[in-house]
Amino acid sequence: MAAAAAGPASSQRFFQSFPDALIDGDPQAALEELTKALEQNPDDAQYYCQRAYCHILLGKYCDGIADVKKSLELNPNNSTALLRKGICEYYEKDYASALETFAEGQKLDGTDTNFDIWIKRCQEIQNGSEPEVSASQRTQSKIKYDWYQTESHVIITLMIKNVQKNDVRVDFSEKELSAVVKIPSGEDCSLKLRLLHPIIPEQSTFKVLSTKIEIKMKKPEAVRWEKLEGQGDVPAPKQFTADVKNMYPSSSHYTRNWDKLVGEIKEEEKNEKLEGDAALNKLFQQIYSDGSDEVKRAMNKSFMESGGTVLSTNWSDVGKRKVEINPPDDMEWKQY
């Protein structure tokens, strides 16, 4: 990975941390670009560590272990590589090795609370108490949600931010909905609903956004749901009549103006004040998220080939040439 030998420390951190934003957006594309980058720089410890992160997001934990081992051979003091190695070992059910790896990483970086979380999970499993099946934790891990309906769909919104699509599982059946979401801390949150009326599972979908998860369940006919869940006797369905004011029922048992709520969330995100690295990361994540496939390819290729010193959205330019290393004027690029 490239680093600046002189100049602001924030720029150095930016060069080292920005690839994770690209990986989160499209782990498969990032995996391909990192593989190309490693063909040119086979001794780059950071590239191996970043590619291991791609494997984790794609669920390829054995490949992830191979990459972090190579990364640690090149740079034994990389706590991030140890964290990713431990996560891969955990999901491969090698809990003893995972615990040892997390403990080693914690010695290198005692400020990273991720090590505490994963060490606790390993210890609970080794002691014979699986945290994910604990009744008390199931209660604590229920997902908060709201719902509303249109003539054709029932829409459920899960109030969870900043999760990846690979960490979300939603299953539809005619009278039941279940969802499991792995949040950034590693904890599984779940939702299971016995629906008041049938839905069409094959035409029901979900979408993962930065601020929420939206689930759309297709109605077989245009009837109004008086509530979301139901068991036993079901009240006779009423013909759907569109509500002019968009006032919808919610799991909180009171009426809510959903359009107003969505507007408030968007306004809050728009006005959120970020500084330094956080502001840069948010800007580039937004460009990547909203960009076309060509824009994403251009950003991946330019960043990887230039060692983190160039970021281009112009595929017609960078697609036909190798992007050269071009650090800022007050910095010197070095390989480590």
UniProtKB/Swiss-Prot annotation:
Origin, by domain of life?
Answer: Eukaryota
Keywords per UniProt? Acetylation, Cytoplasm, Isopeptide bond, Nucleus, Phosphoprotein, Repeat, TPR repeat, Ubl conjugation, Ubl conjugation pathway
Record's SMART domains? TPR
Gene Ontology MF term list: lncRNA binding; protein-folding chaperone binding
Show me the TPR repeat boundaries. Answer: 11-44, 45-78, 79-112
Q: Which residues carry this modification: N-acetylalanine?
A: A2
Q: Where in the cell is it found?
A: Cytoplasm; Nucleus
- Name the Gene Ontology biological process terms: kinetochore assembly; regulation of protein stability; skeletal muscle satellite cell proliferation; spindle organization
State the post-translational modifications.
Phosphorylated at Ser-252 and Ser-302, dephosphorylation promotes nuclear translocation, most likely due to disruption of the SUGT1-HSP90 complex.
Residues in CS domain copies: 140-229
Ranges for domain SGS come to 247-336
Pfam families, per database record: CS, SGS
What's the main place this protein lives?
cytoplasm
SUPFAM superfamilies reported for this sequence: HSP20-like chaperones, TPR-like
Q: Which Gene3D superfamilies does this UniProt record tie to the protein?
A: 2.60.40.790, Tetratricopeptide repeat domain
Q: What does this protein do?
A: May play a role in ubiquitination and subsequent proteasomal degradation of target proteins.
Q: Which family does it belong to?
A: Belongs to the SGT1 family.
Supply the name of the protein.
Protein SGT1 homolog
What species is this protein from? Rattus norvegicus
Provide the taxonomic classification: Eukaryota, Metazoa, Chordata, Craniata, Vertebrata
